[in-house]
């Protein structure tokens, strides 16, 4: 949000706002919320927005503290699965086997060799009253979850899956299609965890092969059929673990 809203004349919002560093959004939001309480202003939900790098990596400590201290803040992570603003470097949210500028593809390395960090599960483990996932491909689901999260007292968290054209090596006209394919193939799941209770908010009528999603993106173009099959098995096992298939 800092990147897209700092150029003139796009800096004016109709709500009070603060531009801060990528990694301290949760810390600043915690301070704002505490300040409002000290002024006797109750019932105001503070909203913080951060990218995946600023959330799952360099801002994790601040976010963990925010949730643990029970600040009345809605934190939204916009996850495009790498540090896209600074040059497509991998983050803890980069999926297994994806190419980035810091996980190049060669004879030894086949892109990112670590699994994507499950940030919603980490926040749920903090016993936040509401945790949800969303996708830019399903805006009505996202809007519904934002309204719900804003109405709940205490720390709430929404993790939004957001394709990036340059970073994912896709044409911008395919952004929404790719976002939907992530959900339809099971590579990204839409759910809520409310007071520890898991609820899948969208289940594809019939899950499509992960190849449909992977082959649309240049960051996965190096994958062999065997490697794609391995990813498919991982997703199948994940769905069984969720108990939704």
Residue ranges and their predicted role:
Residues 1-75, 88, 92-98, 112:
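Cofactor-binding active-site loop characterized by glycine-rich and histidine/acidic residues
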Residues 41-42, 91-151:
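Conserved thiamine diphosphate
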Residues 162-245:
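Flexible, low-complexity linker and terminal segments
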Residues 80-85, 165-167:
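Short gly/pro/ser/thr-enriched loop/turn and capping motifs at secondary-structure boundaries
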Residues 77, 131-134, 157-161:
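Short, conserved beta-strand edge motifs with alternating hydrophobic and charged residues
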Residues 153-157, 188:
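Active-site lining segments that contact anionic ligands and/or coordinate catalytic metals
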Residues 63-66, 91-92, 147-151, 173-178:
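Short, solvent-exposed amphipathic alpha-helical segments in soluble enzyme
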């Amino acid at each position: 949000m800092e990147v897209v809203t700092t150029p003139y004349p796009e800096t004016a919002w109709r709500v009070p706002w603060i531009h801060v560093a990528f990694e301290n959004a949760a810390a600043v939001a915690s301070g704002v919320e505490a300040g409002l309480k000290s002024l006797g202003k109750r019932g105001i939900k503070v909203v913080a927005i951060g990218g995946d790098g600023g959330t799952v990596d360099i801002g994790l400590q601040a976010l963990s503290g925010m949730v643990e201290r029970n600040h009345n803040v809605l934190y939204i992570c916009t996850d495009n699965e790498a540090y896209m603003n600074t040059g497509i470097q991998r983050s803890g949210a980069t999926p297994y086997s994806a190419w980035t500028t810091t996980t190049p593809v060669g004879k030894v390395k086949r892109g990112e060799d670590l699994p994507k960090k499950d940030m919603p599960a980490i926040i749920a483990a903090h016993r936040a009253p509401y945790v949800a996932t969303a996708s830019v491909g399903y805006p009505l689901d996202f809007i519904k979850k934002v309204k719900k999260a804003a109405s709940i007292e205490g720390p709430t968290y929404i993790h939004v899956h957001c394709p990036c054209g340059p970073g994912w090596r896709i044409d911008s006209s395919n952004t929404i299609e790719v976002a939907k394919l992530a959900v339809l193939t099971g590579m990204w799941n839409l759910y809520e965890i409310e007071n520890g209770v898991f609820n899948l908010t969208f289940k594809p009528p019939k899950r499509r092969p992960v190849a449909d999603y992977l082959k649309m993106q240049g960051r996965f173009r190096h994958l062999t059929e065997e490697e794609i099959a391995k990813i498919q098995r991982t997703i199948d096992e994940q769905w069984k673990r969720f108990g939704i298939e």
